[in-house]
Amino acid sequence: MLSPKRTKFRKAHKGRIHGTAKGNTQLNFGQFGLKALEPERITARQIESARRAITRQMKRAGRVWIRIFPDLPVSTKPAEVRMGSGKGAPEYWVARVQPGRIMFEIDGVAEGIAREALKLGAAKLPIKTKIVTRIGEA
């Protein structure tokens, strides 16, 4: 699963996801992509699950680019622990995704296979998405 090799700080604030994506809204690598339509935190496990679904559907032909990276640590406290006594330990990593952000790109496969693969990948994610192409949006 994806996670940073090292970070400046061990823990981070929860924060909010405001507005739409400023960059990474266009396809840069592949012919087809998966664009986010809602703001959400996507976990490293969800990214990996979507990646596996996409690659399996493509029968390992073509190429997949993951355009988001989980760089935000999420900390949790153990079950049945009283309030207070500090923030919990970092448990997993998430990527903040804004609407309009391209999350996955694929190339080297036919359009029908690409659409099916991205549809299966989108089913693994907790947000509404849209399949985009170089020619236009679909």
Curated annotation (Swiss-Prot):
CDD domains: Ribosomal_L16_L10e
GO terms under cellular component: cytosolic large ribosomal subunit
GO molecular function: rRNA binding; structural constituent of ribosome; tRNA binding
Source domain of life: Bacteria
Keywords from the named record: Ribonucleoprotein, Ribosomal protein, RNA-binding, rRNA-binding, tRNA-binding
Any Gene Ontology biological process: translation
InterPro entries linked to this entry: Ribosomal_uL16, Ribosomal_uL16_bact-type, Ribosomal_uL16_CS, Ribosomal_uL16_dom, Ribosomal_uL16_sf
Family: Belongs to the universal ribosomal protein uL16 family.
Function statement: Binds 23S rRNA and is also seen to make contacts with the A and possibly P site tRNAs.
Complex formation: Part of the 50S ribosomal subunit.
HAMAP family assigned to the protein according to its UniProt record, in alphabetical order: Ribosomal_uL16
Protein name, UniProt field: Large ribosomal subunit protein uL16
Source organism: Acidiphilium cryptum (strain JF-5)
Taxonomic lineage of the native organism: Bacteria, Pseudomonadati, Pseudomonadota, Alphaproteobacteria, Acetobacterales
